Curated annotation (Swiss-Prot):
The gene is NKIRAS1. Widely expressed. GO terms for biological process: lung alveolus development; negative regulation of canonical NF-kappaB signal transduction; Ral protein signal transduction; regulation of tumor necrosis factor-mediated signaling pathway; surfactant homeostasis. The keyword Kinase does not apply. The lineage of its organism: Eukaryota, Metazoa, Chordata, Craniata, Vertebrata. Residues 168-192 are annotated as: Disordered. Belongs to the small GTPase superfamily. Ras family. KappaB-Ras subfamily. This is NF-kappa-B inhibitor-interacting Ras-like protein 1.
Amino acid sequence: MGKGCKVVVCGLLSVGKTAILEQLLYGNHTIGMEDCETMEDVYMASVETDRGVKEQLHLYDTRGLQEGVELPKHYFSFADGFVLVYSVNNLESFQRVELLKKEIDKFKDKKEVAIVVLGNKIDLSEQRQVDAEVAQQWAKSEKVRLWEVTVTDRKTLIEPFTLLASKLSQPQSKSSFPLPGRKNKGNSNSEN
């Protein structure tokens, strides 16, 4: 099991961040339940990666963002990964996800950071404001994976979190510094 990765789940108010986590982890979200504003919760999850390794995730369920309110900066400094959530029936929520991605890039200084994007509430397709193709094109241009999901179908939630855990548990790339006792490649030592 890995060291435990910190994942920040963020998006506008009422896009379903808490519902996604509750359904994914406990399978107990009730559709039509009245929204309660989240201050901040931390969920612990053990997620199996695509390599069969279990990765411990600390999922930070953030307070829903509102107009003019930014994600507190401390999240950018400690997060190993992000889940950006928008609602397919709320264009403003998608636009906020676009801004959040830019903020992550700025604060992480373009360092490799695991990000997945979830377009929630696909069961409300008759109220759709975010075109699926436009969202996928944006995700492709930003080099992030995007899934459209619904808390009414728990299976739609599993793959994004499996991929995220897999990205977070990838072995560190090899050091570019020579290790003691090893010869450098391309450095022939003819004096021996």
